[in-house]
């Protein structure tokens, strides 16, 4: 089976969030048994092409977007995946000077790329074309209007339903879409507005989200009734599939960044397992200037953004100070107000023996925190899937979560973690923290059972890939 994914980020090349990681994991698992290709834009300032001798092909092609255009497709293989990067030769201003993936004119940029990608797919042929989020939503309409050879199915995965790609009809008219297909993207209430996600929903053969609970949640999203109508119309061709994590990349067995490696098998003698985590904790605390006197260690490894529940993060700081345990927060702030608030907290708690706030992100430090911490707190307002809780469980770090989206699907309260539900109830959140800390301190048998359940949780990529293959073959 030949599968082509189209997206605007892919973790080995460039990423801004979970989409890039999820696509990488899925493509890697599929590539083990199927011809798998990922098509993304080339961002020259953000990624350097492999040397020419390492490329498997360089193709020139034409596409239509605001007139006849030309592009170059550079292809190479990465871990069995064919990666194709598009340089828009006659529209260089769209990507060549971009210093971030996302800019203010994303709809136009991504539609131009989608037009080039669709032209390439029509030329190359594929059995399955798999789109990721609204960014490449135009590809669905273009391939429905003019299918490629051997095309069996167009699949759309919604990594974050909150972003829809609102744009103008004028931008859709710049493509080769005819009036019928433009109407699939058009809003009835405002014919001059088109929504790339809306058209992709109608033009795709199957729609997936990244967790079963999130699939249910988006059917109850009435923030735009026309988008609600579109997703409701596809509900019988909608399925939630949990993302997986690459256990060859994430795991304490061979992670070179840890002070002490450890394995799930060590848990046959729990004291040896916890001694290994304690060695990692000691090394981390020395690095961060924290006191070893107070346990447990709770961490938050997250973007500090409204989606991630920053109001609960502040409550966690207070709770840690009041109950004498360690809290480590690491993540980049999104938004000036949040940055100011957390920068002030960082400064005021700089000498605290128990709380450390790091307004940055380091992959190495994150791994050391996963290994050292006893619990990881993820109080998201919404979470389509979430990988952090799965990574935490791989390291024997117990998740404390809000029961939403993929967090609800992966964490069972009192079994392999702790959870709360109300997105605005500080009392319920603090009760969850108290229950987790008390269990750690006073009920060692139950704590060991919870950690064991975390280590036994299956989050491998192959499980997710097999579920996608079922959809491809339907």
Swiss-Prot record:
Keywords in UniProt for this one? Glycogen biosynthesis, Glycosyltransferase, Transferase
Q: Provide the catalytic activity annotation.
A: [(1->4)-alpha-D-glucosyl](n) + ADP-alpha-D-glucose = [(1->4)-alpha-D-glucosyl](n+1) + ADP + H(+)
Enzyme Commission number(s) from the entry: 2.4.1.21
The pathway is: Glycan biosynthesis; glycogen biosynthesis
Annotated GO biological process: glycogen biosynthetic process
What GO MF terms are annotated? alpha-1,4-glucan glucosyltransferase (ADP-glucose donor) activity; alpha-1,4-glucan glucosyltransferase (UDP-glucose donor) activity
Pfam families (UniProt xref): Glyco_transf_5 (PF08323), Glycos_transf_1 (PF00534)
- Which residues does the annotation say bind ADP-alpha-D-glucose? 15
Q: Which family does it belong to?
A: Belongs to the glycosyltransferase 1 family. Bacterial/plant glycogen synthase subfamily.
Q: What does this protein do?
A: Synthesizes alpha-1,4-glucan chains using ADP-glucose.
Q: What is this protein called?
A: Glycogen synthase
Q: Which organism is it from?
A: Chlamydia trachomatis serovar D (strain ATCC VR-885 / DSM 19411 / UW-3/Cx)
């Amino acid at each position: 089976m030949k599968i082509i994914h189209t997206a605007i980020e892919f973790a080995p090349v460039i990423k801004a969030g979970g989409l890039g990681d999820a696509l990488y994991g899925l493509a890697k698992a599929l590539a083990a048994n199927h011809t798998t290709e990922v098509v993304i834009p080339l961002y020259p300032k953000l990624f350097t092409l492999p040397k020419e001798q390492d490329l498997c092909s360089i193709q020139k092609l034409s596409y239509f977007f605001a007139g006849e255009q030309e592009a170059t497709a550079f292809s190479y293989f990465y871990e069995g995946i064919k990666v194709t990067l598009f340089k828009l030769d006659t529209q260089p201003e769209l990507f060549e000077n971009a210093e971030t993936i996302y800019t203010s004119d994303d709809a136009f940029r991504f539609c131009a790329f989608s037009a080039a990608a669709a032209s390439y797919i029509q030329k190359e042929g594929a059995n399955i074309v798999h789109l990721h989020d609204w960014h490449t939503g135009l590809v669905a309409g273009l391939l429905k209007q003019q299918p490629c050879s051997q095309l069996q199915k167009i699949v759309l995965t919604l990594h974050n339903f909150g972003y829809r790609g609102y744009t103008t009809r004028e931008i859709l008219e710049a493509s080769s879409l005819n009036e019928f297909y433009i109407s699939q993207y058009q809003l009835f209430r405002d014919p001059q507005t088109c929504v790339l996600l809306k058209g992709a929903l109608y033009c795709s053969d199957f729609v997936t989200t990244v967790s079963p609970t999130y699939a249910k949640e988006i059917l109850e999203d009435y923030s735009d009734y026309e988008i609600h109508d579109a997703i409701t119309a596809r509900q019988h061709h909608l399925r939630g599939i949990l993302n997986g994590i690459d256990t060859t990349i994430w795991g304490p067995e061979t992670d070179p960044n840890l002070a002490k490696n450890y394995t799930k098998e060590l848990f046959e003698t729990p004291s040896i397992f916890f001694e290994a985590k304690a060695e990692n904790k000691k090394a981390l605390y020395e690095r961060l200037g924290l006191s070893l006197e107070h346990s447990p260690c709770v961490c938050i490894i997250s973007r500090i953004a409204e989606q991630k529940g920053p109001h609960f993060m502040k409550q966690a700081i207070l709770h840690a100070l009041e109950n004498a345990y360690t809290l480590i927060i690491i993540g980049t702030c999104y938004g000036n107000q949040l940055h100011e608030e957390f920068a002030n907290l960082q400064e005021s708690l700089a000498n605290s023996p128990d709380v450390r706030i790091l307004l940055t992100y380091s992959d190495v430090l994150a791994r050391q925190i996963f290994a050292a911490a006893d619990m990881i707190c993820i109080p998201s307002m919404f979470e389509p899937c979430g990988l952090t809780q799965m990574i935490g469980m791989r390291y024997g770090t117990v998740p404390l979560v809000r029961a939403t989206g993929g967090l609800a699907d992966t964490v069972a309260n009192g079994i392999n973690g702790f959870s709360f539900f109300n997105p605005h109830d500080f009392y319920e959140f603090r009760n969850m923290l108290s229950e987790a800390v008390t269990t750690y301190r006073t009920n060692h048998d139950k704590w060991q059972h919870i950690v064991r359940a975390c280590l036994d949780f299956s989050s491998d990529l192959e499980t997710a890939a097999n579920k996608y293959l079922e959809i491809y073959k339907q």
